[in-house]
C-alpha cells in the first residue's frame, strides 16, 4: 500500500506544515528513565558547544554587511534557472520554495512555542527526513550557491523563509514585508514528536482526534492527511482535522482558508510513480540514504527520477491553469467545477472535475502542449463543504482583493510568528503595521527614571507596607511567563495586571490585586510629582519591587547586595493583549514556587520543573540556585510550607540545601497527601519538614545533588546569594529585546 511507503502524506500541498510540539510536562522522550529520574538535557545548550562559529560571532552584526537588494535579485534569478539534476516544474522554482518555507515555518506550536522557521531545524534529522518533507532536501540544495555566496551574513533560517517570500512576490503576490533575524541551530532538536505512524494510523489509538500537544495526526505528518483522515476521503472529517491543526498553531478559520487557498494557487503535487512500483523505486529519506548521495534522500529510479517522473506525496496534479501566477482560480475551480473522487497514478485519493472546460485545463509541468485536468485534495473540498470555512471561501471568491490582502497577512504571520516581538526584527523590509499576535507593547513616550529616581522608588516600595514575599512572588509571576521557544511572555508589558494573567490561579488573584493596587498608587504619585517628563511604568515597578524584596531578604540574612535594574519596560493595554493566545503561556506547574494545577502527576513534577527552567533559558546551576533561594524566601504558592527547609523563612540564605542534605533527617512518603514527603528527625522521630518531589530531586538526582552540595558547603554562603541574584536578574530581563544584553 502507498500509505505504508510514504505514510499517505500530501507533501507537495501548501496545506501541510509540520508539528514540532510537545506537552508542557516534557521536552524529550524519557522512556528509559525510572520514575525517580529526571532528564536534564533541556538545560544543556549544546548548540553553543556544537557551533562552528567564532565565539564572538554575532548574527545581527554580521547581517549589517549583507546587500539585501542583491540577495533578493539573486533569489529572483534562481527561480527560473532550472537545473538538470532537479528540473523546475513549469520552469519556475517559486512554488517549490513556497512549500519549503511553509513546511519550515509551519512546524510552529502555539501550545509550547516550539517549532517554526527560527533556528533552521528543517536542515536536521528528523525534520529533514519526515515523509511530509519529501524532496525539500533538493530545495535547500538549490539555495546552497546563494548561502555560499553570502556566507555568515545571512542565516539558513532567514534564507529558507526569504525564498518563499521572494517567490510569492515574483509570481504576483506582493507580501506585506519580511524580517530578518532568525539564527541557526547546529544540531537537531531532541523533541518528542508524538506517536509513530503505525500507532497513530490505528483508529483505536487516534480515534479521529488530534493530540493537542502535537496537532499533527502522526509523527512525520504535516498537520493533516490531504487524502482525508487515515487516508480516507472523508470531507467532513478532514474539515475537523484542519480546524484543530491550524488552531494549534494560532490560526483562525479566516487565516486557515487564506493560507490553504492561497498556497494551492501555485505549483503541483507529485505522484507519478505507479502504486505497484513505489516500493522498489523510491529510496530512503536523507537520514537513511547511502553515504554517496551526500545528504539527499528519496532517490527515485523510476524513469528519469525527476521532472514528470517525480514522486512526492503520491497525489498528482495542479489546482489551477496558471500554477506560477497569483489569482483566485483555486476558488473559482472549487465552486464552479463538479468534483469526482479518483486515484492518482500512485494510488492516492484525490478529486478531478467532471465538467472541466478547455480554460480550466492545467499545463504539464515539463511537456509543452500537454494538458491535464486540475485536481483538488479532500482537504481542499472541506473548505467548501464546512460551514465555517465556506463563509470565508465565498467571501474571498467574491472579493479577490480581500483574498490577496488576507493571504499576505496570514503568510507574514505564518513565517514570523515564532520570532517573538517586533523588537527582534532586523532588515529593511519590516512592515510598519503592528499585529496583536506580535504581543505589542507601546513605545515609551517619556523620560526614563534616573539613578536618583530609582532610589526614591525603592524607598517608596519599602515604605508601602508590602512584604518581601508579596513583592518577590509578584515579580516572579510576571517575568516567569517567558518562553524561549517563541520569545513570548516576560515582564515587559506588565500583562500580569491584565486579563487573562491577572486571573490565573497560580497568580493568586486576590493577593495579586493587593500588590498591584499599591504599586499603581506609587506609580501615580511618582509620575504626578515629576515635571520633567520622567515616568515609571508599572512593568518596571513590579520588577523593581522584586529586587527590593530580594535585597531586603538578603540584608536580613546578613548579606548586602545591590540588584541591577534596567528601566525601560512599558505597559501594554488590554486591547494589545490576545486573551486566548496568552492563555497558552499559563503553566500547569511551576516548581520554583511549588505550584501545580493538579493535572500533572506527582512523579512528573520534577520534569516539569526542568521544562519550566528550559523555557526560562536557565542552565542547571541557575535552576538549582533559584529553587533553593525561593524556598528560603518562603514564596511558595498559597503559602505552602513544602520545601521551606529553614528556621528563618523569608531570609535569603542557603538553608534549603544545608537542611536537604542533612543526614539527621529521614524522608518518607506522606500517607495523607499524594506527592508530599515528610522529613523526620532520625533520633526523635518527630516531623521537621515537608517537601515536594521537586524539592527532593535536588538530593536524589546525582547531577543536581552535586550542584546542591556546592551551595551547602561552608564558605559558599555568599556565593549562593550572589548566584541567586544573578539568576534572578536574568529572569527579570527575559524578553528585554529592546536593550543590548
From Swiss-Prot:
The record marks 99 as: Transition state stabilizer. Its cofactor is heme b. Keywords: Heme, Hydrogen peroxide, Iron, Metal-binding, Oxidoreductase, Peroxidase, Signal. GO terms for cellular component: cytosol. Formation of the three residue Trp-Tyr-Met cross-link is important for the catalase, but not the peroxidase activity of the enzyme. Heme b binds at residue 264. Homodimer or homotetramer. Binds 1 heme b (iron(II)-protoporphyrin IX) group per dimer. This is Catalase-peroxidase. It catalyses: H2O2 + AH2 = A + 2 H2O; 2 H2O2 = O2 + 2 H2O. Pfam families: peroxidase. GO terms for biological process: cellular response to hydrogen peroxide; hydrogen peroxide catabolic process. Its EC number is 1.11.1.21. PANTHER family: CATALASE-PEROXIDASE, HYDROPEROXIDASE I, BIFUNCTIONAL CATALASE-PEROXIDASE. It comes from Francisella tularensis subsp. tularensis (strain WY96-3418). InterPro entries: Catalase_peroxidase (IPR000763), Haem_peroxidase (IPR002016), Haem_peroxidase_sf (IPR010255), Peroxidases_AS (IPR019794), Peroxidases_heam-ligand_BS (IPR019793). It is an enzyme of class 1 (oxidoreductase). The active site is at residue 103. SUPFAM superfamilies: Heme-dependent peroxidases. There is a cross-link at residues 223-249 (Tryptophyl-tyrosyl-methioninium (Tyr-Met) (with W-102)). Belongs to the peroxidase family. Peroxidase/catalase subfamily. There is a cross-link at residues 102-223 (Tryptophyl-tyrosyl-methioninium (Trp-Tyr) (with M-249)). GO terms for molecular function: catalase activity; heme binding; metal ion binding.
Amino acid at each position: 500500500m502507498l500509505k505504508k511507503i510514504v505514510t499517505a502524506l500530501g507533501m507537495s500541498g501548501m496545506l501541510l506544515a509540520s508539528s514540532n510540539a510537545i506537552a508542557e510536562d516534557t521536552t524529550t522522550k524519557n522512556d528509559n528513565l525510572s520514575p525517580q529520574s529526571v532528564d536534564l538535557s533541556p538545560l544543556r545548550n549544546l548548540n553553543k558547544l556544537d557551533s562552528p562559529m567564532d565565539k564572538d560571532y554575532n548574527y545581527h552584526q554580521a547581517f549589517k554587511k549583507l546587500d539585501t537588494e542583491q540577495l533578493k535579485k539573486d533569489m529572483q534569478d534562481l527561480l527560473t534557472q532550472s537545473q538538470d539534476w532537479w528540473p523546475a516544474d513549469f520552469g519556475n522554482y517559486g512554488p517549490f520554495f513556497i512549500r519549503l518555507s511553509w513546511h519550515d515555518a509551519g512546524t510552529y506550536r502555539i501550545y509550547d512555542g516550539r517549532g517554526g522557521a527560527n533556528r533552521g531545524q528543517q536542515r536536521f534529522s528528523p525534520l529533514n527526513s519526515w515523509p511530509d518533507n519529501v524532496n525539500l532536501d533538493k530545495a535547500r540544495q538549490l539555495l546552497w550557491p546563494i548561502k555560499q555566496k553570502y556566507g555568515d551574513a545571512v542565516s539558513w533560517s532567514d534564507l529558507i523563509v526569504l525564498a518563499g517570500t521572494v517567490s510569492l512576490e515574483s509570481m504576483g503576490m506582493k507580501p506585506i514585508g519580511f524580517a530578518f533575524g532568525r539564527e541557526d541551530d547546529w544540531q537537531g532538536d531532541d523533541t518528542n514528536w508524538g506517536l509513530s505512524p503505525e500507532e497513530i494510523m490505528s483508529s483505536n489509538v487516534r480515534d479521529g482526534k488530534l493530540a493537542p500537544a502535537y496537532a499533527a495526526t502522526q509523527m512525520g505528518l504535516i498537520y493533516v492527511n490531504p487524502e482525508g483522515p487515515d487516508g480516507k476521503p472523508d470531507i467532513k472529517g478532514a474539515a475537523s482535522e484542519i480546524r484543530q491543526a491550524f488552531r494549534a498553531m494560532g490560526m483562525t478559520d479566516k487565516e486557515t482558508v487564506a493560507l490553504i487557498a492561497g498556497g494551492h494557487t501555485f505549483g503541483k503535487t507529485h505522484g507519478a510513480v505507479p502504486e505497484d512500483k513505489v516500493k522498489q523505486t523510491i529510496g530512503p529519506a536523507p537520514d537513511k540514504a547511502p553515504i554517496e548521495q551526500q545528504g539527499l534522500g528519496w532517490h527515485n529510479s523510476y524513469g528519469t527520477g525527476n521532472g514528470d517522473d517525480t514522486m512526492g506525496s503520491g497525489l498528482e496534479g495542479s489546482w489551477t491553469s496558471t500554477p506560477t501566477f497569483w489569482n483566485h482560480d483555486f476558488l473559482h475551480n472549487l465552486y464552479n467545477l463538479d468534483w469526482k473522487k479518483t486515484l492518482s497514478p500512485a494510488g492516492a485519493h484525490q478529486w478531478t472535475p467532471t465538467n472541466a472546460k478547455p480554460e480550466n485545463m492545467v499545463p504539464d509541468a515539463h511537456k509543452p502542449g500537454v494538458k491535464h485536468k486540475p485536481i483538488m485534495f479532500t482537504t481542499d473540498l472541506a473548505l467548501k463543504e464546512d460551514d465555517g470555512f465556506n463563509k470565508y471561501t465565498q467571501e474571498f471568491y467574491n472579493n479577490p482583493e480581500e483574498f490577496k490582502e488576507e493571504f499576505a497577512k496570514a503568510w507574514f504571520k505564518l513565517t514570523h510568528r515564532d520570532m517573538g516581538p517586533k523588537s527582534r526584527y532586523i532588515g529593511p523590509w519590516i512592515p510598519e503595521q503592528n499585529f496583536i499576535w506580535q504581543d505589542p507593547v507601546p513605545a515609551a513616550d517619556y523620560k526614563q527614571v534616573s539613578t536618583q529616581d530609582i532610589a526614591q522608588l525603592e524607598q517608596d516600595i519599602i515604605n508601602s507596607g508590602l512584604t518581601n514575599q508579596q513583592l518577590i512572588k509578584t515579580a516572579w509571576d510576571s517575568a516567569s511567563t517567558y518562553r524561549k521557544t517563541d520569545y513570548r511572555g516576560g515582564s515587559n508589558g506588565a500583562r500580569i495586571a491584565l486579563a487573562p494573567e491577572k486571573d490565573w490561579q497560580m497568580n493568586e488573584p486576590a493577593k495579586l490585586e493587593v500588590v498591584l493596587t499599591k504599586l499603581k498608587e506609587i506609580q501615580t504619585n511618582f509620575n504626578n510629582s515629576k515635571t520633567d517628563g520622567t515616568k515609571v511604568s508599572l512593568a518596571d515597578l513590579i520588577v523593581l519591587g522584586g529586587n527590593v524584596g530580594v535585597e531586603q531578604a538578603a540584608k536580613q540574612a546578613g548579606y548586602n547586595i545591590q540588584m541591577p535594574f534596567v528601566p525601560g519596560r512599558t505597559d501594554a493595554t488590554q486591547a494589545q493583549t490576545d486573551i486566548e493566545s496568552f492563555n497558552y503561556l499559563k503553566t500547569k506547574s511551576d516548581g520554583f514556587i511549588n505550584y501545580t494545577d493538579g493535572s500533572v502527576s506527582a512523579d512528573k513534577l520534577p520534569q516539569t520543573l526542568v521544562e519550566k527552567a528550559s523555557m526560562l533559558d536557565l542552565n542547571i546551576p541557575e535552576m538549582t540556585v533559584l529553587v533553593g533561594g525561593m524556598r528560603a524566601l518562603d514564596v511558595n504558592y498559597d503559602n505552602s510550607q513544602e520545601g521551606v527547609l529553614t528556621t528563618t523563612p523569608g531570609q535569603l540564605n542557603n538553608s534549603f540545601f544545608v537542611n536537604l542534605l542533612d543526614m539527621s533527617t529521614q524522608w518518607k512518603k506522606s500517607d495523607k497527601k499524594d506527592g508530599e514527603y515528610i522529613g523526620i528527625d532520625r533520633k526523635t522521630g518527630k516531623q521537621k519538614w515537608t517537601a515536594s518531589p521537586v524539592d527532593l530531586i535536588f538530593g536524589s538526582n546525582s547531577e543536581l545533588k552535586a550542584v546542591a552540595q556546592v551551595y551547602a558547603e561552608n564558605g559558599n554562603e555568599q556565593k549562593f546569594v550572589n548566584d541567586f541574584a544573578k539568576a534572578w536578574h536574568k529572569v527579570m530581563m527575559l524578553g528585554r529585546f529592546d536593550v543590548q544584553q
